[in-house]
Amino acid sequence: MAYFDYTSAKPVDERVLEAMLPYMTESFGNPSSVHSYGFKAREAVQEAREKVAKLVNGGGGTVVFTSGATEANNLAIIGYAMRNARKGKHILVSAVEHMSVINPAKFLQKQGFEVEYIPVGKYGEVDVSFIDQKLRDDTILVSVQHANNEIGTIQPVEEISEVLAGKAALHIDATASVGQIEVDVEKIGADMLTISSNDIYGPKGVGALWIRKEAKLQPVILGGGQENGLRSGSENVPSIVGFGKAAEITAMEWREEAERLRRLRDRIIDNVLKIEESYLNGHPEKRLPNNVNVRFSYIEGESIVLSLDMAGIQASTGSACSSKTLQPSHVLMACGLKHEEAHGTLLLTLGRYNTDEDVDRLLEVLPGVIERLRSMSPLYRR
């Protein structure tokens, strides 16, 4: 098997699993309890919090643990907007954001907020001048990904931060970028930053929102007031410990790993683009080291994915969170592609356990798959 769907799901690193196990069977206390078991659990959560903050140079803020990146994005968008509505109700969101940002923004529109979507160019880069032009006295929030999870394009977040100059809060969804490129909240000027555990080989079902001390949010989940009152519900201690360990490993190893993945990525791109009428989606240079997003004329991405799976190669057509809808990717549509072009897309994402042999297998199988599918397409003519 050759797995090229690391953006959808990653395995838990064995070192992470080892760190988690004692908190499932031995140190199983509730962090809110006042006895020794609770103290040990509380101490473990705090240690993990510090490790996650350190990964993004987040000493100037706090980490709030959530059930994942989706909840963290909801907390950032809805929580910040609701808390700061008296300052204004104008929000800017990029057109290529994950649906866990776009749908909360749509929810806010129904609550009386005005949301404008920042357009992107053909490579998926946001138009910074649009942000500059649209900034108003009542603009309270701008939300932009650090890098796109589908096409891999890295956004000019530092430039955006300079344009904002503190006039509005900046939320950055760094789900796709942490562990792939440098993520430093001070350098990029983030007021809030979303991080996913599984995207750095930690357990699923846990994520975090880093929040600068000056940023004030309203909780979106109410209950016992855990996580400094911003996220109620007993903390998932084993998963949080695993998240912390994954952050610790990532901080030490990401640069070397990114360079290895970049080499594999470039090898795939160079060879796949030799196939007739194949095109790279996303920026040719400013892209994540693990991302290959290509489209093929005259065939559908779903057919390519199924054919590759039959050959023992796993890939995808886009975001796993919305790929079941069979709708064309809103990211690719925002980049100006036609419906049929967006439907012909194959997404290959590399990860920690990919090898040169995996790439060999992919490059051996893929050209034949494309040729076979095109031979059955009524649109294809040699």
From Swiss-Prot:
GO terms for cellular component: cytoplasm. InterPro entries: Aminotrans_V_dom, Cys_deSase_IscS, Cysteine_dSase, PyrdxlP-dep_Trfase, PyrdxlP-dep_Trfase_major, PyrdxlP-dep_Trfase_small. Its main location: cytoplasm. Pyridoxal 5'-phosphate binds at T70, N149, S234. Gene3D superfamilies: Aspartate Aminotransferase, domain 1 (3.90.1150.10), Type I PLP-dependent aspartate aminotransferase-like (Major domain) (3.40.640.10). Belongs to the class-V pyridoxal-phosphate-dependent aminotransferase family. NifS/IscS subfamily. This is Cysteine desulfurase IscS 2.
